[in-house]
Swiss-Prot record:
Protein family: Belongs to the transferase hexapeptide repeat family. DapH subfamily.
InterPro entries: DapH (IPR019873), DapH_N (IPR013710), Hexapep (IPR001451), Trans_hexapeptide_repeat (IPR050179), Trimer_LpxA-like_sf (IPR011004)
Name of the gene: dapH
EC numbers for this chain: 2.3.1.89
Organism: Lacticaseibacillus casei (strain BL23)
Function statement: Catalyzes the transfer of an acetyl group from acetyl-CoA to tetrahydrodipicolinate.
Name under which the protein is recorded: 2,3,4,5-tetrahydropyridine-2,6-dicarboxylate N-acetyltransferase
Catalysed transformations (reactions): (S)-2,3,4,5-tetrahydrodipicolinate + acetyl-CoA + H2O = L-2-acetamido-6-oxoheptanedioate + CoA
Lineage, opening ranks: Bacteria, Bacillati, Bacillota, Bacilli, Lactobacillales
Enzyme class: transferase
One annotated GO biological process: diaminopimelate biosynthetic process
Keyword Transmembrane helix attributed: no
Length: 234
C-alpha cells in the first residue's frame, strides 16, 4: 500500500476549520427556530434535534425560548473528522474510532475499541483486534493480525520520520508495542507483550523487552498462528 502524503496530512490538521460537533435535543416552542444550512435540523412542533457546530447553534439557543435542551458534545475544536466508513469494503465493529485519511483494504476487520489515527493504512484481510492503536501513518500489510491492546507508534511529526511498517502475513500478539521507525518483515511473529525497538527480519519470531529474535518461523509456529479467512468474510 502506498504511504499517504505526509505534508497533506499535516496541512489537513493545521488548516482545517476547527469545530465543536454537538447533537442538541430540544423541547419547547420550536416553530420560530431557524438554523443555517450547515446545521442538520430535525424539528417537530414541540421537540427536535439539531446536529452541527456548537459555534453556530449556541447563539440561536441563547435567543430561543425553550422549555429545555440537552447538549451532547463529541469533541472540542476538532480538526480532523472521523472517516466515513459507509463505503468501506471491510468489517468495522461498533466502537472503533477511525480518523479521516485512513486507508482500509478489502475484507479487513477492525474490532471494537480499536483506534486508527490519520494516515494509517490497513491491508486487505488484516484484522485489528480490540483496543489496538495504530498511530499516525502506521502501515500494516495484507492478511495480518494485530493483537488486542497492541500499539503501533505513530509519527506525524517530524514529517521526515519513518513510520512503523508491518509486512504481509504478520502475527502480533496482545499488548505488544512497536516503536516508531520500525519495520517488521513479512511472515514474522511478535509475541504478546513484546516491545519492538529494532527491525524484525522476515519469518522470525521475536519476544521480550526489548524484543529479540528467539527462532525462525517453522511448521509448528505456523500451526499456532494460522489466520482464518472465515473470520474475514463479509
Amino acid at each position: 500500500m502506498a504511504q499517504l502524503d505526509t505534508q497533506k496530512i499535516i496541512s489537513t490538521i493545521a488548516n482545517s476549520k476547527k469545530t465543536t460537533p454537538v447533537k442538541v435535543y430540544l423541547k419547547g416552542k420550536l416553530s420560530e427556530l431557524h438554523f443555517p444550512k450547515s446545521v442538520h435540523a430535525f424539528i417537530g412542533k414541540h421537540t427536535g434535534t439539531v446536529i452541527g457546530d456548537w459555534a453556530e447553534i449556541k447563539p440561536i439557543l441563547k435567543k430561543a425560548k425553550l422549555d429545555d435542551y440537552y447538549v451532547e458534545t463529541a469533541g472540542r475544536n476538532t480538526g480532523v473528522p472521523l472517516l466515513d466508513i459507509k463505503a468501506a469494503n471491510a468489517r468495522i465493529e461498533p466502537g472503533a474510532i477511525i480518523r479521516d485519511q485512513v486507508l482500509i483494504g478489502d475484507n479487513a476487520v477492525i474490532m471494537m475499541g480499536a483506534i486508527i489515527n490519520i494516515g494509517a493504512e490497513i491491508g486487505a484481510g488484516t484484522m485489528i483486534d480490540m483496543g489496538a492503536v495504530l498511530g499516525g501513518r502506521a502501515i500494516v500489510g495484507k492478511h495480518c493480525h494485530i493483537g488486542a491492546g497492541t500499539v503501533l507508534a505513530g509519527v506525524v511529526e517530524p514529517p521526515s520520520a519513518k513510520p512503523v511498517t508491518i509486512g504481509d502475513h504478520v502475527m502480533i500478539g496482545a499488548n505488544a508495542v512497536v516503536l516508531e521507525g520500525t519495520t517488521v518483515g513479512e511472515g514474522a511473529v511478535i509475541a504478546a507483550g513484546a516491545v519492538v525497538i529494532n527491525d524484525v527480519p522476515a519469518h522470525t519470531v521475536v519476544a521480550g523487552v526489548p524484543a529479540k529474535v528467539i527462532k525462525q518461523v517453522n511448521d509448528q509456529t505456523e500451526a499456532k498462528t494460522v489466520l482464518l479467512d472465515e473470520l474475514r468474510k463479509l
